[in-house]
């Protein structure tokens, strides 16, 4: 088991670029594989999750060439994938499993999806239910709620589905299945979740229409495109919080994706009093991008809920760290989805922050915590979750003493060079 010990920092300073966006990287492989013609991808995130997606499509006959800088995908068209000869292993990636389940439901072959011990215990019925309404045949453990999942490809029919949860994975699985369905497929959700699938489908030429509260798609061949993947705001979030909570810090993070469905982290931290400027705003491959200038700030506790939650769902572990260093009480609500991530992120952060001296009260769908003047040194657990591990390492920068995080191998899931980048900007 790998461990890493972080010491308190004097400041966080410099200029960095974070790795490519994980969500966009997944989708570039999927859509590039089922489009006609060649797709090139610059800035692809070579983390374990994205490599699981890449390897799955290679196993279905897609030629993906990687020269270390650019991926070149020779698309097969909607009906061109081949039946895999082995189980498709999604590793720790819920995005890979849920989105591929939707895509595979419309194929004319049999496939099986599995993952690691954590992924095999995450809920899948939220995807299987709407796909079954479209005519998909999918089997899984626990009545279809747990992987491995066996997908028997067949003809699909478009549906109108009101998702009870705001989940980009659920929405995207249905939209991908909708590419293969007869008629129109429509999805609505309580609050708008990240819209990378809609943007990229439109960029690839899909017959897609967005409207207030939802999206519609009809089957049509896609055309390969050139994609430049922006920096992942979920990865940038760790460095944003680091620069905010360590006095004397100033950090420029270049080329970050600032899709409005993902900038909840900026809105939350700004509402807490954080100094975050968006510079050099532009659009690349259908996605808004900016450079972020972050300066150390005195943060104050706030209430977080409603439509902010799906716009910052992956950033809540490090938001909890920011709240722990803020003056006063922070209340997080409407975030029950955090309990079914790679681990129960509400419980995991509560355990770790209590070790660091924070007064934390868990609720069913969130938590309440009171910030402290300085976190205490401690030994924290990652619980096998990359975002928990990185969040607690950021906490260590603002602690009185060292924070050691156990089981840090999981960081490679989404951010293989996190430690190296952190060491580059921390002034000890």
From Swiss-Prot:
State the EC number(s). Answer: 2.5.1.19
Q: In which pathway does it act?
A: Metabolic intermediate biosynthesis; chorismate biosynthesis; chorismate from D-erythrose 4-phosphate and phosphoenolpyruvate: step 6/7
Domain of life per record? Bacteria
Kindly list the GO CC terms recorded for this protein: cytoplasm
Q: Which UniProt keywords apply?
A: Amino-acid biosynthesis, Aromatic amino acid biosynthesis, Cytoplasm, Transferase
> Which residues are named in the active-site annotation?
314 (proton acceptor)
* Sites where the protein binds 3-phosphoshikimate: 22-23, 27, 167, 169, 314, 341
What Gene3D superfamilies would the database entry show? Enolpyruvate transferase domain
Question: Assembly and interactions?
Answer: Monomer.
Q: What does this protein do?
A: Catalyzes the transfer of the enolpyruvyl moiety of phosphoenolpyruvate (PEP) to the 5-hydroxyl of shikimate-3-phosphate (S3P) to produce enolpyruvyl shikimate-3-phosphate and inorganic phosphate.
PANTHER family cross-referenced by the UniProt entry: AROM/DEHYDROQUINATE SYNTHASE, PENTAFUNCTIONAL AROM POLYPEPTIDE
Task: Tell me the protein's name.
Answer: 3-phosphoshikimate 1-carboxyvinyltransferase
């Amino acid at each position: 088991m790998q461990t890493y010990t972080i010491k308190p920092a004097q400041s966080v300073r410099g200029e960095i670029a974070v790795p490519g966006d994980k969500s966009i990287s997944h989708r570039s492989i999927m859509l590039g594989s089922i489009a006609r013609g060649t797709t090139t991808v610059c800035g692809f995130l070579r983390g374990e999750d994205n490599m699981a997606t890449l390897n799955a499509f290679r196993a279905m006959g897609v030629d993906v060439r990687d020269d270390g800088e650019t991926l070149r995908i020779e698309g097969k068209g909607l009906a061109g994938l081949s039946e895999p000869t082995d189980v498709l292993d999604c590793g720790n990636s819920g995005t890979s499993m849920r989105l591929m389940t939707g895509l595979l439901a419309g194929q004319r072959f049999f496939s099986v999806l599995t993952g690691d011990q954590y992924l095999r215990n995450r809920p899948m019925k939220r995807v299987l239910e709407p796909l079954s309404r479209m005519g998909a045949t999918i089997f899984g453990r626990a009545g279809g709620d747990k992987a491995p999942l066996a997908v028997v490809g067949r003809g699909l029919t478009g549906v109108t589905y009101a998702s009870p949860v705001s989940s980009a994975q659920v929405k995207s699985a249905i939209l991908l299945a909708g590419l293969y369905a007869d008629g129109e497929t429509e999805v609505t959700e309580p609050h708008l979740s990240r819209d990378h699938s809609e943007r990229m489908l439109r960029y690839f030429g899909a017959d897609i229409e967005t409207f207030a509260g939802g999206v519609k798609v009809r089957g049509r061949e896609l055309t390969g495109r050139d994609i430049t993947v922006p920096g992942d705001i979920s990865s940038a979030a760790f460095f944003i919080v680091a620069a905010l909570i360590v006095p004397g810090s100033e950090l420029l993070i270049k080329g970050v994706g600032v899709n409005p469905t993902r900038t909840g982290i900026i809105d939350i931290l700004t509402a807490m009093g954080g100094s975050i400027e968006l510079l050099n705003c532009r659009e690349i491959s259908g996605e808004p991008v900016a450079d972020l200038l972050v300066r150390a700030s005195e943060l104050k506790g706030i209430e977080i809920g409603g439509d902010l939650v799906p716009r910052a769902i992956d950033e809540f572990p490090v938001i909890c760290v920011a709240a722990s260093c803020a003056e006063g009480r922070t209340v997080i609500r409407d975030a029950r989805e955090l309990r079914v991530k790679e681990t129960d992120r509400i419980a995991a952060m509560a355990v770790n922050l209590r070790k660091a001296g924070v007064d934390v009260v868990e609720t069913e769908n969130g938590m309440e915590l009171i910030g402290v003047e300085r976190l205490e040194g401690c030994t924290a657990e990652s619980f096998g979750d990359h975002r928990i591990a990185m969040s607690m390492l950021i906490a260590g920068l603002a602690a009185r003493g060292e924070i050691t995080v156990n089981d840090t191998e999981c960081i490679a899931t989404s951010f293989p060079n996190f430690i190296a980048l952190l060491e580059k900007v921390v002034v000890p």
